[in-house]
Amino acid sequence: MSNKLKVTLIKSMNGRLQAHQQCVRGLGLRRIHQSCEVQDTPENRGMINKVAYLLKVEEVL
């Protein structure tokens, strides 16, 4: 299992719950189609699962 994940914001945060916006910001994303790599930890997985409908997630090999 990879220890990094590539996370891409594919939908807008406008009109979303404040907690969901904070999760996206916590993952290091600000703009649509912006990507970043995060460590594969339970904390990050929890944030990703909470806002999965806004994101595209890939394992980095």
UniProtKB/Swiss-Prot annotation:
Coiled coil: none annotated. One of its GO terms (molecular function) is structural constituent of ribosome. GO terms for cellular component: cytosolic large ribosomal subunit. It holds the Pfam family Ribosomal_L30. SUPFAM superfamilies: Ribosomal protein L30p/L7e (SSF55129). One of its GO terms (biological process) is translation. Keywords: Ribonucleoprotein, Ribosomal protein. CDD domains: Ribosomal_L30 (cd01658). InterPro entries: Ribo_uL30_ferredoxin-like_sf, Ribosomal_uL30_bac-type, Ribosomal_uL30_ferredoxin-like. The keyword Transcription does not apply. Part of the 50S ribosomal subunit. Belongs to the universal ribosomal protein uL30 family. This is Large ribosomal subunit protein uL30. It comes from Dichelobacter nodosus (strain VCS1703A).
